[in-house]
Amino acid sequence: MNASCCLPSVQPTLPNGSEHLQAPFFSNQSSSAFCEQVFIKPEVFLSLGIVSLLENILVILAVVRNGNLHSPMYFFLCSLAVADMLVSVSNALETIMIAIVHSDYLTFEDQFIQHMDNIFDSMICISLVASICNLLAIAVDRYVTIFYALRYHSIMTVRKALTLIVAIWVCCGVCGVVFIVYSESKMVIVCLITMFFAMMLLMGTLYVHMFLFARLHVKRIAALPPADGVAPQQHSCMKGAVTITILLGVFIFCWAPFFLHLVLIITCPTNPYCICYTAHFNTYLVLIMCNSVIDPLIYAFRSLELRNTFREILCGCNGMNLG
């Protein structure tokens, strides 16, 4: 609960109002001896969860409503929006659960609290794996768009994209269950860290290759006479690649402190400086939730079509041409 996913809880204590229902293994309760923990009000988690939920629902509604957005990339963005919703909703519900546990009106057995903790931890784990897999799928989609432009519509069809999305979520569901079943093992943390860095390396390689190709292509186009359709098409492909690169950068920025937290738990659990860093776990959770809030803003900023659809849904502008 407001804890890192899938790791064992050792005691049913609550260090402060924004902490976990059960103190996770890596929350390092002794950290207060070395540095002061940052108190984050429960309202922050709840507010971020609600904003993220509304924003990502808007993204999904926009893609469903606008036929021009029925393409593999936007379907992958919808899947990423669901992953963003999952992590924010889990933390918001967790905050509500903490408030209920702290109230004098209801009491719960420790076993029930442990079950709820496992459910919310599983949701966070599933969201993490889903986010990484969807970002990778989008990277592959942009890669195919740039390097196999003439065959793109036969290689990456809507049906194939939807099948891949279903496969991603089935895999994520299995991972969530496995992480909970083996939550007592440190191998869970090792697997999460390994997956994160392996996926980041793979996506980084794809994007470096794409932008090197784009740079070479721009030089070649500049040396040729103007040809209608060539430059605009390439510009459109690269604009999509830039958008996903921004998404990836924000994802790394928001999730990196969490993964550094996991790395320190494995490598130096008793070092005072490591303990001090891990004392601020709730801050890293807030960053993760901020990622879920920022992503829809990036979609809107980078896509005029999506932005217009948002405006139509929110304002009811019937005169807008959505093609």
Curated annotation (Swiss-Prot):
PROSITE patterns: G_PROTEIN_RECEP_F1_1, G_PROTEIN_RECEP_F1_2
Annotated keywords: Biological rhythms, Cell membrane, G-protein coupled receptor, Glycoprotein, Lipoprotein, Membrane, Palmitate, Receptor, Transducer, Transmembrane, Transmembrane helix
Glycosites: 2, 16, 28
Lipid attachment, kind S-palmitoyl cysteine: 315
Compartments it resides in: Cell membrane
Segments passing through the bilayer: 38-63, 76-100, 119-140, 161-181, 187-210, 246-268, 278-301
Biological role: Receptor for MSH (alpha, beta and gamma) and ACTH. This receptor is mediated by G proteins which activate adenylate cyclase. Required for expression of anticipatory patterns of activity and wakefulness during periods of limited nutrient availability and for the normal regulation of circadian clock activity in the brain.
Name by which UniProt lists this protein: Melanocortin receptor 3
Encoding gene (name): MC3R
